[in-house]
């Protein structure tokens, strides 16, 4: 379930400072659930803080973009640098053991930035406008993420994608990832999207044709389990902007990218 800024303001306020290595012994900047036991952070001030964090500017066409010298970009650069060091070592170790190393990337706000949509829609979600936005296939890349995809591939690491986007949004996602520079393994065997009409057998514990009861964690961790147990890979790293992208195991290490604009439980 995706919660708007208004529904998750308290949690987002804690996350605005950035992101961190998650699930590997290092505490993250943020929290996995909103805390509503006290007066929430003021929304007007939070929006200003978000603009400052992203260094939000509008281009000549009025599209809202993040600044490459913003605190957001600097947080991403730190995460990417650490991840590259880790991937280099972990890939060599896995290959030495005869394992098949893999990485998993979320798409929305992990590879493709949705800041323009969030700002235009006052940080609220609507399925129809979101679908139009995704299928327009014109989102900019999250700073450094396409380079990280290509870096993993260069180290002999198999790249997979695990997204909450739907099968109906596949063409838009593929076109946008190509445009953004993440043109690696964009086939259906490597990009896992939600198929509520015909869910895969490995999700039978929470989804059957026509009935989808999977939480985000069940869907994403179940897909990672499939990659490891059925496809025979060892997921050495998992990247996402939501804690629900990362929870549930089936990855040696997880990286939480910053996103203070919405919360997916």
Where are these regions (language model features)?
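Non-catalytic pre-domain segments flanking phosphatase-related domains
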Residues: 2-105
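C-terminal cap/substrate-recognition subdomain and adjoining C-terminal extension
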Residues: 3, 30-38, 170-265
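Second-shell loop/turn segments in exported
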Residues: 64-74, 131-139, 160-165, 209-214
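Structured segments of extracytoplasmic/periplasmic soluble domains
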Residues: 82, 86-93, 114, 118, ...
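Surface-exposed patches in mature extracellular/periplasmic domains of secreted proteins
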Residues: 90-102, 157-165, 186-189, 236-238
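Asp-based phosphoryl-transfer active-site loop
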Residues: 101-114, 161
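A solvent-exposed, charged loop/short amphipathic helix patch at secondary-structure junctions
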Residues: 119-136
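Short, acidic loop-to-helix structural element flanking the phosphoryl-transfer center
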Residues: 131-160, 167-173
């Amino acid at each position: 379930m995706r919660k708007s800024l208004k529904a998750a303001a308290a949690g987002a306020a804690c996350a605005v400072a950035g992101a961190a290595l998650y699930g590997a012994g290092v505490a993250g900047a943020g929290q996995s659930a909103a805390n509503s036991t006290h007066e929430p952070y003021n929304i007007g001030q939070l929006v200003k803080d978000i603009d400052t964090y992203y260094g939000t500017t509008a281009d000549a066409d009025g599209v809202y973009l993040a600044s490459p010298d913003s605190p957001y970009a600097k947080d991403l650069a730190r995460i990417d640098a650490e991840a590259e060091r880790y991937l280099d070592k972990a890939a060599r170790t896995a290959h030495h053991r005869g394992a098949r190393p893999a990485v998993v990337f979320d798409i929305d706000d992990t590879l493709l930035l949705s800041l323009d949509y969030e700002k235009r829609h006052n940080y609220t979600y609507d399925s129809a406008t979101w679908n139009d936005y995704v299928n327009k296939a014109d989102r900019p890349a999250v700073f450094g993420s396409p380079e990280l995809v290509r870096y993993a591939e260069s180290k002999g690491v198999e790249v997979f994608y695990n997204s909450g986007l739907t099968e109906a949004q596949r063409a838009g996602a593929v076109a946008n990832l190509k445009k953004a520079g993440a043109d690696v393994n964009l086939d259906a065997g490597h990009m896992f999207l939600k198929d509520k009409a015909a869910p895969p057998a490995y999700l039978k514990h929470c989804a059957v044709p026509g009935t989808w009861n999977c939480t985000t964690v069940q869907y994403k961790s179940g897909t990672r389990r499939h990659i490891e147990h059925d496809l025979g890979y060892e997921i050495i790293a998992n990247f996402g902007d939501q804690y629900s992208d990362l929870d549930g195991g089936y990855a040696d290490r997880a990286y939480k990218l910053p996103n203070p604009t919405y919360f997916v439980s």
